[in-house]
């Protein structure tokens, strides 16, 4: 029943326009940088980005363990591809900075909320795809933290939304890809 309720919320979801993203090139490395202002305090956002039970509800991957401590080794299974990678948390300064795999998360207090910045090292060919996907994941995260979950929208599920295709096109235009 709970999954059905989440899916019904998902049916009424439509992402806003592409925003809060940029690309940085350093040699051969490309980094997608996304900034999102959330209405929730850093401690709450920290739990959502480190706890596997919370990640399951919004992130584009499953984590088999908690990501909240340096040295933690966790397997990530990406929803879009099923690819599994073992990663080690290299930085965990709760509730402000988290680094593992190709991801770096920074949480900054912003009034009663949080400015979330994600750096994602990504293949240049997939930058617009990644930006559209993270955009939707962050929308889902915001609703989850507000107590109005709509269910995970990631991987193939995200691509079914007309909004995902529009976002991907908007980000592709923005990034010239």
Write out the residue ranges for each language-model feature.
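Short beta-strand segments
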Residues: 83-87, 103, 114
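Short, solvent-exposed secondary-structure boundary/capping segments
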Residues: 96-102
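A structural signal for short hydrophobic beta-strand segments in well-ordered beta-sheet cores
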Residues: 23, 89, 105-107
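Solvent-exposed residues in well-ordered beta-strands and their adjoining turns
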Residues: 37-41, 77, 108, 119-123
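Short, flexible helix/strand-to-coil boundary loops that buttress conserved ligand/catalytic motifs
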Residues: 49, 59, 145
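Short beta-edge strand/loop motif at the mouth of beta-sheet-based domains
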Residues: 25-34, 40, 44, 52-95, ...
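Short, conserved charged micro-motifs
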Residues: 43-47, 128
């Amino acid at each position: 029943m709970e999954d059905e309720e989440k899916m019904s919320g998902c049916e009424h979801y439509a992402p806003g326009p592409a925003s809060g993203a940029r690309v940085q090139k350093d040699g051969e490395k490309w980094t997608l940088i996304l900034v999102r202002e959330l209405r929730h305090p850093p401690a709450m956002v920290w739990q959502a980005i480190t706890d596997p039970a919370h990640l399951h509800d919004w992130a584009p991957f499953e984590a088999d363990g908690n990501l909240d401590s340096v040295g933690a080794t966790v397997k990530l299974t990406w929803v879009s591809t099923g690819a599994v990678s073992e990663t080690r948390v290299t930085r965990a300064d709760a509730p402000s900075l988290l680094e593992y795999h190709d991801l770096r998360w920074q949480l900054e207090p912003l009034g009663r909320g949080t400015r979330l910045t994600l750096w994602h090292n990504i293949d240049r060919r997939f930058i617009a795809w990644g930006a559209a996907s993270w955009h939707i994941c962050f929308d889902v995260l915001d609703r989850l933290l507000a107590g109005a979950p709509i269910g995970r929208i990631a991987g193939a599920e995200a691509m079914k939304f007309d909004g995902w295709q529009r976002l991907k096109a908007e980000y592709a235009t923005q990034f010239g890809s």
